[in-house]
Swiss-Prot record:
Cytoplasm in keyword set: no
Oligomeric form and interacting partners: Part of the 50S ribosomal subunit. Forms a cluster with proteins L3 and L19. In the 70S ribosome, L14 and L19 interact and together make contacts with the 16S rRNA in bridges B5 and B8.
Keywords: Ribonucleoprotein, Ribosomal protein, RNA-binding, rRNA-binding
UniProt cross-references to Gene3D superfamilies, sorted A to Z: Ribosomal protein L14
Pfam families: Ribosomal_L14
Gene encoding the protein: rplN
SUPFAM superfamilies, alphabetized: Ribosomal protein L14
InterPro entries (alphabetical): Ribosomal_uL14, Ribosomal_uL14_bac-type, Ribosomal_uL14_CS, Ribosomal_uL14_sf
Identification of the protein by name: Large ribosomal subunit protein uL14
GO cellular component term of the entry, any: cytosolic large ribosomal subunit
Length: 122
């Protein structure tokens, strides 16, 4: 579960390395974001020649969380770190590569581009 002030790794090659959640999209009182949810983030660390710079505000979709995700078949899936992929207003990823596995839950949210770029879908 991601909330305001949560720090996440960036799982793409947009140039950002670490981001911090500053807003969870979806209602004025929404507190937590799970896998597949869109959040507003501030870039806290970035590469020198990346597409995004430190201090920029961007949108991101959560792709991995430490909090387990329960599946309809009863199985659970969790990751070691929280991670997100930066997206633009249209929902397309800013980067051209995705690092690390992503979950099947993104398919239900219509993030097909992220799923096709990911090396592994769990």
């Amino acid at each position: 579960m991601i909330q305001v002030e949560s720090r996440l790794e960036v799982a793409d090659n947009s140039g950002a390395k670490k981001v911090q959640c500053i807003k969870v999209i979806g209602g004025s009182k929404r507190r937590y974001a799970r896998v597949g949810d869109v959040i507003i983030v501030a870039v806290k660390a970035a590469l020198p020649r990346g597409k995004v710079k430190k201090g920029e505000v961007a949108r991101a979709v959560v792709v991995r969380t430490k909090k387990e995700i329960s599946r309809p078949d009863g199985s659970l899936i969790r990751f070691d770190k929280n991670a997100a992929v930066l997206i633009n207003k249209a929902g397309e990823p800013v980067g051209t590569r995705i690092f690390g596995p992503v979950t099947r839950e993104l398919r239900a949210r219509n993030y097909m581009k992220i799923i096709s770029l990911a090396p592994e879908v769990l």
